[in-house]
A protein has these predicted regions:
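Active-site-proximal or metal-binding-adjacent scaffold patches in catalytic folds
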Residues: 1-85, 94-125
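Walker B catalytic acidic pair
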Residues: 90
């Protein structure tokens, strides 16, 4: 029964229209506020700017020089664990701009189950 529930939830997310970016900002800001303390030292105590766009090919992006994280509006339709994964992933870019071993080690230290969370997004594409 649980498998059917998950399939139904996945179908509902796929059929749902992409939310408006402004409607997603409170959710993404709340997740960012929970993640920020782990990165406060790196960011000099200043929270990054969180922006939301209608992006089709990415879940998020990070612009360290601008102290800005941009998230896809469609991310709001994904499970909370997946949203948190993307936010942590983008925060990790403030420390490691690339996807080398240090980047993944930092992410794993914050979200040990990051691979399962990323899989939620890979299945949603």
């Amino acid at each position: 029964m649980a498998e059917n529930d998950e399939k139904a939830a996945e179908a509902a997310r796929a059929a749902a229209p992409t939310p408006r970016p402004a409607d997603c900002l409170p959710l993404f800001q709340a997740v960012s506020d929970r993640v920020f303390p782990r990165f406060a030292g790196v960011l000099g105590g200043q929270k990054p700017i969180i922006k939301v766009r209608d992006m089709r090919t990415r879940w998020g992006s990070c612009h360290p020089a601008k102290r800005q994280i941009t998230l896809a509006a469609r991310l709001a339709l994904q499970p909370p664990e997946a949203v948190e994964y993307v936010v942590v992933h983008e925060y990790c870019h403030f420390v490691h701009p690339d996807h080398q071993a240090g980047f993944w080690a930092l992410g794993a230290s914050i979200l040990p189950d990051w691979k399962a969370r990323r899989a939620l997004l890979r299945n949603a594409r």
